[in-house]
Regions:
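Metallocofactor- and cofactor-centric catalytic cores in central/energy metabolism, strongly enriched
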Residues: 2-290
């Protein structure tokens, strides 16, 4: 149903059979990855939301869309191409993206996460099409608050996954490509824990890279400088944590794929102060002991 509310989806349930108010119409609605239903918009919705002429005539169910999307997925020649297809699908229609994975979780988990996501991360700059997530620059700590303020108010974010990209999935320093591990981990939270994707925030701390290939690569999208250590690094981490606590006080912070010395040190520093978790230290430890 049409309405006058802004497109703030933070408090929507993960799934609903009820009508939702939406102020978007026409091409703007089709460009909204969360609300776009593609060929599943009914005749009534096409009239109400000014979509007539913007979609093929046949109205399809979500099940029919899933069938087509799975066929498209299956024709991709290799796992990286399948990963890229899934990323593209997510950028167009999130409901279809999550439903497709849910129906084929065992097959697609290795595509959207390890091991295939590692290859996608290593090629982040060459495969880049559009940004997703929050990018924090170690040389601009004064802009952290502005950067993190764009995802809603104090009650809008439940979970933040943050990485500095130094030790990604066993493949080492991936620099700014670390944003993809934050995104992938949050997709797993949605699929396996039911956390609404629009109540999460993926973050990368761009502190440079010691990956020589990236430092020499003109198309690398992150800071082309050696990794920052010491006080300047700690200032960015601390500014991020304090800003997250200020802007999203109910959010749980998940530290992901930091280099081991920093991972342990950061966890020890902030565990007494905030709700936080490091998967590589605590998650791996728990699984090993189990």
């Amino acid at each position: 149903m049409a309405g006058n509310k802004s497109s703030d989806f933070s408090h929507l349930p993960l799934a609903t059979n009820k009508a939702m108010e939406c102020a978007l119409t026409g091409s703007e609605l089709l460009s909204c990855t969360y609300l776009n239903k593609g060929s599943a918009f009914t005749e009534e919705e096409r009239d109400e939301f000014e979509l007539v002429g913007l979609l093929p005539s046949n109205v399809q169910t979500l099940d029919e869309q899933v069938k087509r999307a799975y066929a498209q997925f299956s024709t991709r020649p290799d796992n990286l191409a399948k990963n890229t297809f899934m990323t593209s699908l997510k950028e167009q229609n999130e409901v279809l993206y999550y439903r497709l994975i849910q129906d084929h979780l065992k097959e697609m988990f290795p595509i959207i996460y390890t091991p295939t996501e590692g290859e996608a991360i290593s090629k982040y700059s060459s495969l880049f099409r559009r940004p997703e997530g929050c990018f924090l620059n170690v040389n601009e700590p004064e802009k952290v608050e502005q950067s993190m303020s764009q995802w809603g108010g104090p009650d809008d974010i439940d979970l933040i996954v943050v990485s500095d990209g130094e030790q990604i999935l066993g493949i080492g320093d991936q620099g700014v490509g670390g944003i993809l591990i934050s995104i992938a981990k949050l997709a797993i939270y949605t699929l396996c824990a039911g956390i609404h994707p629009h109540r999460t925030l993926p973050v990368v701390l761009d502190t440079g890279t010691n990956n020589e290939d990236f430092l020499k690569d003109d198309i690398y999208l992150g800071l082309r400088q050696e990794r920052v250590r010491g006080e300047k690094y700690d200032k960015l981490v601390d500014t991020f944590v304090k800003t997250a606590r200020k802007q999203y006080p109910n959010a749980y912070i998940h530290f992901e794929d930091f280099g081991l010395p920093n991972a342990r040190r950061i966890l020890d520093e902030y565990t007494p102060k905030i709700a936080c978790f490091n998967d590589d230290v605590q998650g791996t430890g728990c699984v090993t002991l189990a």
